[in-house]
Amino acid sequence: LFGGVRFDTTADIPIPASLIDQVIGQEHAVDVIKKAATQRRHVMMIGSPGTGKSMLAKAMSELLPKEDMQDIMVYPNQEDNNNPIIRVVPAGRGKEIVAHHKEDAKRQASSRNTLLIVLVIGVLGISFISGQLLMGIIAVAFLFMAFRSLIPKESVMVPKLIVSNKPDSFAPFVDATGSHAGALLGDVRHDPFQSGGLETPAHDRVEAGAIHRAHKGVLFIDEINSLEYQSQQSLLTALQEGVFPITGQSERSSGAMVRTEPVPCRFLM
């Protein structure tokens, strides 16, 4: 017998389905968390290690409405490759849109390859008949180069899903404790090629940060003073504006030239 509950093993003890109801001995904190989730307010928790701060923060994410969840996507910008376009869609739609674009890209690639094969066969056939086989081979080489450099790759047009949520899942809970600037604010990966037809499109190198993945959810940071001062300033800006663009965090990286449109990051911290 313990706490008015009789049991033989711990398996006999009923566990509440909701995480907030599993918190023991923090009645006032539980009440504050419930009110903050309802009113969408930030919470500062002060306490010794092991008192349930992270558990309360995670429980808060379960109290937020599921209907508001969204996916965030990055599209290529035809006018300015270094300024990718941001689009927000309902949760679950992002994967469907990406799959649809990939199918279109496959069909376009198949059509392009078929056209290239027909042209190669035609050029080689004509050069063989006319006795100019060497010129035909040179013409085929130029064809390959033209198709590779002048005709854009279909993959360039496929948007990238940087924040994905399930329609029936809880609001996201993201622990950003001790994160460096790129992990917290987002980053753009370095492209070692950058030209020659081997480069990776700018929008495909964009990576969401913790503040973006926590959009419509909870961002938890333990010991916020462990963050760099510049990261703290940027975090304050994101809190105030509710949006924050993603750019390369390293000055020596090619990603430093890329800056997206403002990305939604309306989180509770």
Where are these regions (language model features)?
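Conserved ASCE/P-loop NTPase catalytic core
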Residues: L1-M269
